[in-house]
Swiss-Prot record:
Single GO BP term: lipoprotein biosynthetic process
Organism lineage: Bacteria, Pseudomonadati, Pseudomonadota, Gammaproteobacteria, Vibrionales
Pathway named in the protein's UniProt entry: Protein modification; lipoprotein biosynthesis (N-acyl transfer)
Protein name per its UniProtKB record: Apolipoprotein N-acyltransferase
Topological relation to the membrane, as annotated: Multi-pass membrane protein
Localisation: Cell inner membrane
Enzyme Commission designation: 2.3.1.269
UniProt keyword list: Acyltransferase, Cell inner membrane, Cell membrane, Membrane, Transferase, Transmembrane, Transmembrane helix
Active site: 264 (proton acceptor), 330, 382 (nucleophile)
A GO molecular-function descriptor: N-acyltransferase activity
Length: 506
């Protein structure tokens, strides 16, 4: 019986281990080749399995991937949730268990509809089904498109495909390569290993192609203020003005910058409470021919709260006034951090479901760019930068930069902020726009239009990042078309693989 049990569990156990290794493909490890190998191993592991067996093998792979890959979430739950260890572990386990459903859905559907390891099934059907599972994970329950495999390729030759089809195209190519490797191993057809080699070589060739044109005449000096404010102290009334003056003093030392940028919710107060201060800040910035952008919390007249971005100084908005129509309001809210699903049930259960600032309202999906010192910027607050379609639709022909403000202090010295920066870099590469990322305690950085970090400052330090950024003109194919070509490719791939299966079985 023990032998039978071991025989039944050995593939799921192996899959969990392989899934956990997938984290090595992402920041901070960035062994990008791992993202090609681990899905190939998953395809090999489910070869010959029943649908039910494949489902559990895929589930184990996903459990391993997310247990290691999003371990940083536990830092926030344990540090700020106010619950005992058992409750913290239960919540973390529940999140991992939920996310593992999507790899399980992939393996089950593959074995259900395309069980045979044919070339068409592995090169067309498997990548298409993987993308469908990714899209569902990025949409269901507001979505969590973290650890999409394509993000791991930001520094690989495949990165050159991102301006053409976005991070999803990179994921597709990884799965095509993984399918070829699986086919080679299963059928001992080693010539199929040429397929991932050709994909990587093509990516290298594309790296010399520029889809957009830099505009050196519009080069801009920016100063990013990293306040390094302790998250446990930030919202204490006694710390309000020390925090505000910290950012103010650091800004005074950098008035020669064209744009000064503070992080998400840098001002620990409602905007309506600070009209005199903000009016004086606006005047000082104008006097120094500069502009300041900051994250701030807002409350509308109807009582709704918003996580917002405001700009003062040299802006098209005139002298400072409390006008919420001239602010950017975060649209994609963080579950449990900024809104609580089923809050009437969950809020009474534990402090974690009743965190401060966890009752925000959404802004519109598409909003006007923030304009500072003549430069339009497409904003994304923290978690929003992981939603590629939202960022894409907020970039216009006039947009000079991508702007993301964040506060990753919730996640301490974990790998979370490093993965977050990796995702932000992908947005710059996809859209051909330089990226400005201002955070409370890191990673504060700026990238060029290829997603390469050109300046950064260390985490967990009070510091100012000075840099010069050059806007670009033009649109990448991904900016113009979005994911529609991939939707069509997925539909055609599944149709062709299904037609070939039916014809073979006839």
């Amino acid at each position: 019986m023990k032998n039978t049990l071991f025989h039944r569990l050995k593939r799921p156990i192996a899959a969990a281990f392989v899934g956990a290794l997938t984290t090595l493909a992402f920041a901070p490890y960035q062994i990008w080749l791992v993202a090609l190998i681990t899905p190939a191993l998953l395809l090999i592991l489910i070869h010959g399995q029943s649908r039910r067996q494949a489902l559990w093998t895929g589930y184990a792979w996903g459990f391993g991937q997310f247990a290691s890959g999003i371990s940083w979430v536990y830092v926030s739950i344990a540090g700020f949730g106010g619950m005992p260890l058992a409750a913290n572990l239960f919540l973390m386990g529940a999140l991992i268990a939920y996310l593992a459903i999507y790899p399980a859905l992939f393996t089950w559907s593959y074995q259900r509809f395309f069980a045979k390891a044919t070339l068409l099934n592995l090169l067309l059907a498997a990548p298409a089904l993987w993308l469908i599972a990714d899209w569902l994970r990025g949409w269901v329950m507001t979505g969590f498109p973290w650890l999409w495999l394509g993000y791991s390729q930001i520094d690989s030759p495949l990165a050159s495909f991102a301006p053409i089809g976005g991070v999803e195209l990179l994921t597709l190519l990884l799965l095509v390569g993984a399918g070829a490797i699986a086919y080679a191993v299963i059928h001992k057809r080693w010539s199929m290993l040429l397929i991932p080699t050709v994909l990587l070589s093509t990516g290298y060739g594309l790296s010399h192609w520029d889809w957009v044109t830099p505009q050196p005449d519009k080069t801009t000096k920016v100063a990013l203020i990293q306040g390094n404010v302790d998250q446990n102290l930030k919202w204490l009334p006694s710390q309000r003005w020390p925090t505000i003056m910290k950012y103010t003093d650091l800004s005074r030392e950098n008035w020669d910058a064209d744009i000064i940028i503070w992080p998400e919710a840098a001002i620990p107060a409602f905007e309506v409470e600070l009209p005199s201060y903000l009016s004086n800040l606006d005047s000082a910035a104008k006097m120094n021919q500069s502009a300041i952008i900051s994250g701030i919390v807002n409350q509308a007249e109807d009582g709704q709260f918003y996580n917002s971005i405001l700009a003062v100084g040299l802006t098209p908005y005139g002298d400072y006034s409390f006008d919420l129509t001239e602010r950017y309001h975060k649209h994609h809210l963080l579950p449990f951090g900024e809104f609580v699903p089923f809050e009437q049930i969950l809020r009474p259960l534990a402090p974690f479901f009743n965190l401060p600032m966890s009752s925000f309202s959404r802004g519109d999906f598409v909003q006007p760019n923030i304009v500072a010192n003549g430069h339009p910027m497409a904003p994304a607050l923290c978690y929003e930068i992981i939603f590629n379609e939202q960022v894409r639709q907020n970039v216009t022909d006039d947009t000079d930069f991508l702007l993301t403000l964040s506060n990753d202090a919730w996640f301490g010295r974990s790998i979370g902020p490093l993965q977050h920066m990796e995702i932000a870099r992908m947005r710059a590469l996809e859209l051909g726009k330089p990226l400005i990322r201002s955070t409370n305690n890191g990673l504060t950085a700026v990238t060029d239009h290829r997603g390469k970090i050109i300046a950064s400052i260390p985490q967990f330090e009070t510091a100012v990042l000075r840099a010069e950024l050059t806007p670009t003109q033009g649109q990448t194919p991904y900016h113009q078309l979005g994911s529609w070509p991939l939707y069509i490719w997925v539909a055609l791939s599944l149709a062709l693989a299904w037609w070939r299966k039916r014809r073979t079985n006839a």
